[in-house]
Amino acid sequence: MSQKTSSCVREAVENIEDLQNAVEEDCPTGCHSKLLSVSHSLGDTVPFAIFTSKSTPLVAFGNVGELDNGPCFNTVFFRVERVHGSCATLSLLIAFDEHKHILDFTDKDTVCEVFRLEKTNYCIEVDLDCFCAINCLNPRLINRTHHH
């Protein structure tokens, strides 16, 4: 009898969740390295993007219809909130350029224009087995205010 093994994307997201929880309770940007450190004051978020088998980043939408305060936006950046089996709840991170303009990833903007990411209350449920790659980003992008 063969047992399905965990995917590397799922393992990475579970590791990110553990790292975030450890910081909340108490480098190179690989998804299994110590991205968050209490001594470095990097906060409680490891931002990341995940990709399909066609190397396409997952794009999600927040505040559709603008029923809440703030603009409608799309993003390719996420924070893991909870992993449950092969599924995960991811919160959307809204991306801004250095002029505080919201970036649109369905348009001409590229990820290289990202200056700052902010946490939101908008979430998406994903099946982690549907993704083939994960790109962890520097936690210093969260709420960044100036160039280093």
From Swiss-Prot:
InterPro entries: Spore_coat_protein_Z/Y (IPR019593)
Keywords: Disulfide bond, Sporulation
GO term, biological process aspect, one: sporulation resulting in formation of a cellular spore
Chief location of this protein within or outside the cell: other
Superkingdom: Bacteria
Location in the cell: Spore coat
Membrane spanning stretches: none
Similarity comment: family membership: To B.subtilis CotY.
Subunit: Disulfide cross-linked either to itself or to CotY.
Protein name: Spore coat protein Z
The organism's taxonomic lineage, starting at the top: Bacteria, Bacillati, Bacillota, Bacilli, Bacillales
Gene symbol of the encoding locus: cotZ
